[in-house]
Amino acid sequence: MDVENLIITTLKDKVKELTGTEMDIRLEEPPAINMGDYSTNISFRLAKDLKKAPKMIAEDIANSLSISGIERIEAVNGYINFFMNYPDFSKETVSKITSEKENFGKLEKRGEKVILEHTSANPNGPFHIGHGRNMVIGDSLKRILIASGYDVETQYYVNDMGRQEAIVVFGNERFELDKSKKADHAIGEVYVETNKLLAENEELEQEILNLMKNYESACEAGIENELTEKFKNAVDYSLGGFKETLSTLNIYHDKFVWESEFVKSGMVRDVIKRLMDTGKVVEDEVFRLDLSDYGLEKKLVLARLNGTSLYSTRDIAYHINKMENCDFAVNLLGADHKLTAVLVNKTLALLGYNEAEVVFYEFISLPEGSMSTRRGRFISMDELFEEAKSRAAEEVRKRGVAQSEEEIEEIAKKIAVGAVRYNIVRIAPEKPMVFRWDEALDFEKVGCPVIQYAHARCSRILENVENISNDNLFAYEMNENEKTIVKLLSKLPKIVEKAAEVRKPQIVANYVLDVAQGFNKFYANCPVLKEENETIKNSRLAIVSTTKTVLENTLDLLGIEMPGKM
C-alpha cells in the first residue's frame, strides 16, 4: 500500500469537493516521527478561496477524512498531520522486502533504451581522480537507471585520432615501454617524456601533424597498414590498463566505441556534407558552423579547408550514431566541456536529432594540490585506491576481525572500493569537491564504512538465527526507533525512481547513509537477541533482516560490496 499517494489522492478529492478545482499537492515529512509521518499546508492555500482561517479549514478537513493505513489525523496551527498505522505498515513493508529480496527497489521495465557514455579518458596515461569522479558517477547512474526499469548500454568513446594519441605513437618509436609497469602507466611515462622532447625540439611538431593526417587518410580510405597497426596497438595497450582500474572499482562498459570507426564508415564525411547543405557553414581559415539561430555567438569549427575532419565533426557523427540507437542518451562530462556540449547538441538539433542529456561534474582534488597529466604530476586512481586499501587494512588489523592476511586483504579491498566510490558519489556532481581521507574512511559518521559496518552488525545478529516467526509481527506499541527504520526501509523504490528521474546518484548515497544511521539508533535502543518477549524479538529480527537486504540492494546501486565482517 502506497500510503503517501493515498493521502495525496484523498486530499485532491477533498479540495475538488470544497472548491470545484484541482490543486497540486505535495506532502512534507515532519522533522520528528512523533509530529506525524506526513504533513500538508493546503489549508493556507485554500484560505483565500474558502474565506476562512487556515486553522479552521485544517480542523474541518482533518475531522472529515478517513484514509486506509492512517491511524489518526491531527490539525495543528493550520497544518494537517497524518500518523500511519505502524503495525500494519511494518508487516506489509517487511513482507514485501522479504519476498522480493534482491529485487526490492527495482521498478517495472519501461521498454526504453538509454545509451550512457562515461569515463572516455584519452588513452595517453592512467586515470587521474578527475576521471574517477566521472566513472563513479557514471557507473552509479547506470545501475540506478537499470533498477528504475531502463535498458541501459554504457559506452566508452575512445579518442584514437587526436594529437595526444599521435604523441604516444611517436613516443613509442623513441622511448622503450616499461613492460614491468601497468600498461596505462607505462604509456603515460612515454607520453610525458615525448612532451618534454617536443618542447625542446619544436621542429618535431610537424611529424606529429603528419602522423595525425596519415592516420586519418588511412582510416578514410579503409586501409590497414603499419601506421594504423601502431595506433591500434598503442590504444589497445592503454585500454588494457584502463580496464584493470575500472574492474577493480566494479565498473564495466558494454561497448568501447573508437572515434576512427566514424571516419572509416564514411559517416564523418556524410555529416560534413549534410551540414554544408544547411547553408549555415561559413569559411575563413576553416569551415565553421553558424548556430546563431540557437542563440549561440560562438561557431562550431567543423573541418579544415582541405576537408579533413576535426574532433568536433567526429563527435557529432558519434552522437548521431547514439541517437539512432536509443530513446535517449546521457553523457557524463566535466564542467569545462559545457560550451562544447551545447554546440554539439545544437548541431544535432539542426540535423533533426534529439539532444543528448548531459550530467556535468566539477573538479575534484586532494588536499595535497592539483593534477596535470601532461607534466606527469597527478594522483592516479590506482594510487588513490592502493592508499585507500592500505589505510583500510591497517584499520582491519586494529579491529582484529580477520583470521589471516588473505582475509585482511579481501576485507580491505571491499572497504577501499566503498571508501573511494561512496566518498565521490555522495557529493552532488555540480559541486567542486576535495577528497579527504578522514571522511572516506570514517567509521563513525559519513563514510561508507559506517554503512558497511551496519551491514556487518546485521549479519552478526542473524548468524545463529535459523528462522524468524511471522506470528503476530509488530502486534505491540512500537517505539520511535523501530518506526523510523521501517519507514526508511520502505522508501527504497521511491528513492530509485527519484534518483533516476533527476539523474542524481547522490540521492541514493544519502539515503543509504540515513538507513545505516537509522539502524544504528535502533540497535542502540532496541534489544534484539536479548529481548524476552517473543513477538517483539521476532519483529526486531525481521527489521534486522530487512535492513540487511536494503543495505545490500542500495550499495549495489553504487557498485559497492559488503565485507561481511568489520
From Swiss-Prot:
GO terms for molecular function: arginine-tRNA ligase activity; ATP binding. GO terms for biological process: arginyl-tRNA aminoacylation. Keywords: Aminoacyl-tRNA synthetase, ATP-binding, Cytoplasm, Ligase, Nucleotide-binding, Protein biosynthesis. It catalyses: tRNA(Arg) + L-arginine + ATP = L-arginyl-tRNA(Arg) + AMP + diphosphate. The keyword Heme does not apply. Disulfide bonds: none annotated. It is found in: Cytoplasm. GO terms for cellular component: cytoplasm. A motif ('HIGH' region) lies at residues 121-131. Gene3D superfamilies: Arginyl tRNA synthetase N-terminal domain (3.30.1360.70), HUPs (3.40.50.620), Isoleucyl-tRNA Synthetase, Domain 1 (1.10.730.10). Its EC number is 6.1.1.19. Its main location: cytoplasm. It is an enzyme of class 6 (ligase). It comes from the Archaea. The keyword DNA-binding does not apply. NCBIfam families: argS (TIGR00456). Belongs to the class-I aminoacyl-tRNA synthetase family. PANTHER family: ARGININE--TRNA LIGASE, CYTOPLASMIC (PTHR11956:SF5), ARGINYL-TRNA SYNTHETASE (PTHR11956). This is Arginine--tRNA ligase.
